Amino acid sequence: MFFGVMMVFSGKGLVGFRGWALVAACGAAVMASVVLVACGGGTTQQTVFKATRVLAFGDETSVLTPTGMKYAVNALDANAAVDCLANPLWIQTVAKIYTFVYPQCNPTASTEVKAFTLAAFGAQVNELRAQIDQQVSGGGGIGGGIGAGDLALVLVGANDVLALYAQYPTRSEADILTDARARGDLLAAQVNRLVNLGARVIVSSAIDMGVTPYAVAQKAAFTDTDRAALLTRITAALNGRMRVGILNDGRYVGLVLADEMVQTMVKSPASFALTNAVSVICNVALPNCTSKTLIDTATEATWLWADATHLSAAGQTRLGSLAQQRAQGNPF
């Protein structure tokens, strides 16, 4: 039991000499409760982080259009109108922890409009810096600055992978991977910048483009090399440098592994109640895809991909669940 307590406190670095003295004073009779409360006072050892604002950065995976449409599958209500609260984006799932809503999706006129996305369609890693600059300067129209109380959500990199892949074979794979690693370094630097500004950060690795329907098609179309495997290697190069470059401290940064998530979902779709993890579900271009514009017999809750490179509702839901776990489980 004592070993278990030591693991909790020393692992998170939250209690010093005074904390251990308090444990000793409590005595063996209450050792089992030390993990949760201090002896006699009922005060938690760790203050639970309560975000006062959620800020999302990155690409279209985190975009809500002005009318609440998503680059995924948009749900419809009984009147065939878009229900922007249903089939939530991962950033909406995280904001819901705090009862926050985004201004683009507030059909109930909630007063808790404290979640904002600066993400943009087509954004690459170098544009993440501009998004953060915009927020710091107050140019986003949502209240400037970034600081304590802000929870920043970051997901970018897929468009970088696709852009780099498009340069093959004009550029060698080695050159492309070097470029991808440099972009991973830049991504890590921007995550650390958010921490230095005072925010807590949940950053997701880029989705593995090598397991997408796009990758399946590319592999079938070219015989020079396994194009799907190449897309995975480019993704891994970017993600790998991001992972080693971000601040390795769970008090400030929570990491979501979206690349491993989609890899697992593709390998074992039944484990996630999926009936299809390799094909495209939408018959129209995003963000105009709705539950009424899907291929016959398909449902967004059981198909992984909305289009060739973007997650359907099933993928967004899983990603949101993982990010929510980080928001609630990390010692922010």
Q: How would you describe each model-predicted region?
A:
Residues 17-30:
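Sec-dependent N-terminal signal peptides
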Residues 1-18:
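N-terminal secretory signal peptides that target proteins for export/translocation
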Residues 12-13, 32, 296-298:
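Intrinsically disordered, low-complexity regions enriched in Ser/Pro/Gly/Gln/His and often acidic
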Residues 2, 39-332:
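Conserved active-site regions of diverse hydrolases
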